[in-house]
Design a protein with these regions (language model features):
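Short amphipathic alpha-helical leader/targeting segments
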Residues: 34, 167, 182-186
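Amphipathic alpha-helical interface segments
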Residues: 1-143, 149-155
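Conserved phosphate/anionic-ligand binding catalytic regions in large, soluble enzymes, centered on
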Residues: 13-17, 160-173
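Extended hydrophobic-aromatic, low-complexity segments
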Residues: 146-150, 162, 181-183
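Active-site proximal loops enriched in glycine and acidic residues that flank catalytic Cys/His/Asp
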Residues: 153-154, 164-167, 188
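Alpha-helix C-terminal capping segments
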Residues: 24, 142, 169-178
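Conserved glycine-rich phosphate/nucleotide-binding loop
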Residues: 173, 177-191
Length: 191
């Protein structure tokens, strides 16, 4: 069922970094086929478990799924869409005792306004999945376009490529492909 380790010290950010394509596909299936949230999250959790099977890692990917789905609507301000995504994900995870216990680790992302106001020096961007989702959301909340979001993520230091990938995925969903600087696209091989 999974290859990833499930211990508490196995909460790296690798599965979160790779989950974006799955989230986009599941969002499409929800729109086209009426796939239910519970089914989407089962799939997201199984995908995470390929490399990171601890519930905290799987929940991070689940929260990311909700962020992708809500940001793709682009019908409200970014902070409002993110808050809605977090509210929906917390409501889902509060239904299960195990995941409900894990929600304490996500306390800093519970309120987008409070998260946005945290000082940069208090944002960690290492390899721990909780740090990564916090940093990605913080970067998105504290910028107003794709480029600045990705640069802010990189400038946090530490695990810069992963934090930028996680934040950049969400920024790309919200701001769109045309928001990516052309000179960044030009250097992509075989694009």
């Amino acid at each position: 069922e999974y290859a990833g380790l499930a211990g508490g010290d196995s909460n790296g950010n690798g599965s979160l970094m790779r989950i974006l394509p799955v989230c986009i596909y599941l969002k499409y299936l929800q729109e086209e086929c009426g796939l239910k949230d519970v089914t989407c999250l089962e799939i997201v959790h199984k995908m995470s478990a390929l490399t990171h099977a601890h519930l905290r890692s799987k929940m991070s990917c689940g929260i990311y799924f909700y962020c992708v789905r809500e940001l793709a609507k682009r019908n409200k301000p970014l902070e409002e869409l993110l808050q809605n995504a977090v509210d929906l994900s917390f409501a889902f995870y509060e239904k299960n005792n195990d995941s409900k216990k894990e929600l304490e680790h996500f306390s800093r992302i519970r309120n987008m306004e409070k998260l946005r106001k945290i000082l940069a020096e208090q944002i960690n961007s290492g390899g721990y999945v909780i740090e990564s989702i916090e940093a990605a959301l913080w970067c998105l909340l504290n910028t107003s376009d794709f480029k600045d979001c990705v640069l802010k993520a990189v400038n946090l230091g530490h695990d810069t490529d992963t934090t930028a990938a996680i934040a950049g995925g969400l920024a790309g969903i919200y701001y769109g492909y045309k928001s990516i600087p052309e000179h960044w696209l030009e250097i992509i091989i075989r694009r």
